[in-house]
């Protein structure tokens, strides 16, 4: 499924060797995916239980995932333009 694909991407990314300048890009990308996975775990708990706290945790984690991804993209663009 989708989560398994994300986990495979993380495993591949963690094995990937990149230039020192690009390590923060890769690390932010990994952090983004890890937060996305955790978000889905909490969202599933919310769907099953109706617990609004789980929904809030899910949304917060998804927001963190977006922020990490945005940082990765911005760092990459800076490196490519620099």
Where are these predicted regions, by residue range?
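C-terminal amphipathic alpha-helix
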Residues: 1-2, 38-82
């Amino acid at each position: 499924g989708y989560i398994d694909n994300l986990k495979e991407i993380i495993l591949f990314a963690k094995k990937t060797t990149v230039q020192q300048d690009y390590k923060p890009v890769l690390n932010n990308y990994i952090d983004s995916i890890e937060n996305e996975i955790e978000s889905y775990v909490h969202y599933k708990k919310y769907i099953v239980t109706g617990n609004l706290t789980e929904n809030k945790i899910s949304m917060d984690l998804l927001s963190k995932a977006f922020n990490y991804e945005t940082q990765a993209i911005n760092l990459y663009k800076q490196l490519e333009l620099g």
